[in-house]
C-alpha cells in the first residue's frame, strides 16, 4: 500500500526535505531504486550511487546537504531508519490462530488459544506454547519444554525436553535447542574394551527474550545446570554453542563460529565468521573477534582480537604484514649469508 513521504519521515523521526504528500510505493537499494522508492545512504563509499540514484527519496545522515530532484529524510542512523521502513512495508503475515489438522498436541501439553500450529508441528507431554507463537511444519516442542509468546519456530526446529525459550524468539529452519552436549569420559576398562563413556547431559538450554537463531544452528543442553543465550543475542546460521556456554545479552555470533563447553561470551560481543572459542575461558564485554580467529585465552573487555591464536588486532596486523614480506626477507638473508661466506673465504684462515 502506498504511503505518503511525510508519514514515513514521521515514522522514523526524521527531518524531511521535500514534498510530504509524495507517494512512496516501496524501498530499494540506491542503484536499483526508481521513482516511488525510498533508499538510504549511510556510507561515503556509496557516494557515486547516491549521486546517480533515481529514488524519489533517500534516508541520509544529518550532515548531508539538500539535493535537487531527490527528497531527503535526515535521520541519526540511516541504516536503522531503513530497517524500520522495511518492517513497516513488509510486516510479516501471521497465520490465523489455531491448531491445524495434522498437527499433534499431547493431552497434557498447554497451547495458548492464540498460538498457531501448522500441519506436522508437535508439542509433547507437558510442553507449553505461548500466545501468538507460530510453529511451522515439522517444528517440535519436547516434554516439559516451554516456548514463550510471539515466537516463530520455522520448519523442522527442535526444542528438546525441559528447555526454555523466552518471548519474541525466532528459531530458523532446522535449528536444534537442547541436543546432548558433547561429553565423554574415557574408560579403559569398558565391557567391550576401552571406550568413551557417555556423560549424561541432564541440564537444559535457556534462551532469553528477543533472541534470533539462524538455520541449522545447534545449542547444546548443559551437562548440569543451564546453557544460556542472553536477551537480544543474535546467532547466524551454522553456529555451534556447546554445553554450559553462556552467551551474553546483545552479542552477535556469525556463521560457522563455535563456542566450546563452559566458555562465557560477554555482553555485546561480536564473534565474526568461523571463529573458534576454546572451553572454560571468557570473552569480555564488547570484545570483537575477527573472522577465522582461534581464541585460546581470556579476552579482556572491549578488546579487538584477530588471528589464530588470537592476539590484539594491531599486533595481528603487524604480524600479517611481516608474513607478507617473508619471501623477500629470506632472499635477503640468503644473499647476506653468501656475502659473509665470500668475505670469510677472502679473509682466509
Curated annotation (Swiss-Prot):
GO biological process terms held by the UniProt record: lipid A biosynthetic process
Protein function: Catalyzes the N-acylation of UDP-3-O-acylglucosamine using 3-hydroxyacyl-ACP as the acyl donor. Is involved in the biosynthesis of lipid A, a phosphorylated glycolipid that anchors the lipopolysaccharide to the outer membrane of the cell.
GO (cellular component) term, any one: membrane
GO MF, one annotated term: N-acyltransferase activity
Naturally occurring in which organism (per UniProt): Myxococcus xanthus (strain DK1622)
Name under which the protein is recorded: UDP-3-O-acylglucosamine N-acyltransferase
Keywords attached to this entry: Acyltransferase, Lipid A biosynthesis, Lipid biosynthesis, Lipid metabolism, Repeat, Transferase
Catalytic activity: a UDP-3-O-[(3R)-3-hydroxyacyl]-alpha-D-glucosamine + a (3R)-hydroxyacyl-[ACP] = a UDP-2-N,3-O-bis[(3R)-3-hydroxyacyl]-alpha-D-glucosamine + holo-[ACP] + H(+)
Amino acid at each position: 500500500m502506498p504511503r505518503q513521504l511525510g508519514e514515513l519521515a514521521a515514522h522514523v523521526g526524521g527531518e524531511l526535505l521535500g514534498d510530504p504528500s509524495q507517494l512512496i510505493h516501496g524501498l530499494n537499494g540506491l542503484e536499483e531504486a526508481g521513482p516511488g522508492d525510498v533508499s538510504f545512504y549511510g556510507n561515503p563509499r556509496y557516494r557515486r550511487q547516491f549521486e546517480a540514484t533515481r529514488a524519489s527519496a533517500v534516508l541520509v545522515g544529518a550532515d548531508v546537504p539538500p539535493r535537487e530532484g531527490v527528497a531527503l529524510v535526515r535521520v541519526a542512523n540511516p541504516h536503522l531508519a531503513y530497517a524500520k521502513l522495511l518492517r513497516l512495508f513488509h510486516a510479516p503475515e501471521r497465520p490465523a490462530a489455531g491448531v491445524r489438522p495434522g498437527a499433534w498436541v499431547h493431552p497434557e501439553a498447554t497451547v495458548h488459544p492464540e498460538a498457531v500450529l501448522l500441519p506436522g508441528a508437535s508439542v509433547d507431554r507437558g510442553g507449553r506454547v505461548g500466545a501468538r507463537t507460530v510453529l511451522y511444519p515439522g517444528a517440535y516442542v519436547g516434554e516439559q519444554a516451554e516456548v514463550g509468546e510471539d515466537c516463530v519456530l520455522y520448519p523442522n526446529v527442535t526444542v528438546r525436553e525441559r528447555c526454555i525459550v523466552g518471548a519474541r524468539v525466532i528459531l530458523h529452519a532446522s535449528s536444534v535447542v537442547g541436543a546432548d552436549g558433547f561429553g565423554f569420559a574415557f574408560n579403559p576398562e569398558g565391557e567391550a574394551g576401552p571406550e568413551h563413556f557417555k556423560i549424561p547431559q541432564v541440564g537444559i538450554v535457556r534462551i532469553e527474550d528477543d533472541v534470533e537463531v539462524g538455520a541449522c544452528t545447534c545449542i547444546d543442553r548443559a551437562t548440569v545446570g543451564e546453557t544460556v543465550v542472553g536477551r537480544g543475542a543474535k546467532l547466524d546460521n551454522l553456529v555451534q554453542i556447546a554445553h554450559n556456554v553462556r552467551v551474553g545479552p546483545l552479542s552477535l555470533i556469525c556463521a560457522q563460529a563455535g563456542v566450546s563447553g563452559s566458555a562465557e561470551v560477554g555482553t555485546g560481543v561480536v564473534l565474526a565468521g568461523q571463529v573458534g572459542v576454546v572451553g572454560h575461558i571468557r570473552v569480555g564485554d564488547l570484545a570483537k573477534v575477527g573472522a577465522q580467529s582461534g581464541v585460546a585465552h581470556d579476552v579482556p573487555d572491549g578488546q579487538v582480537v584477530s588471528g589464530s591464536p588470537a592476539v590484539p588486532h594491531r599486533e595481528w596486523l603487524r604480524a600479517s604484514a611481516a608474513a607478507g614480506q617473508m619471501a623477500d626477507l629470506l632472499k635477503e638473508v640468503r644473499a647476506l649469508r653468501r656475502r659473509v661466506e665470500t668475505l670469510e673465504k677472502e679473509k682466509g684462515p
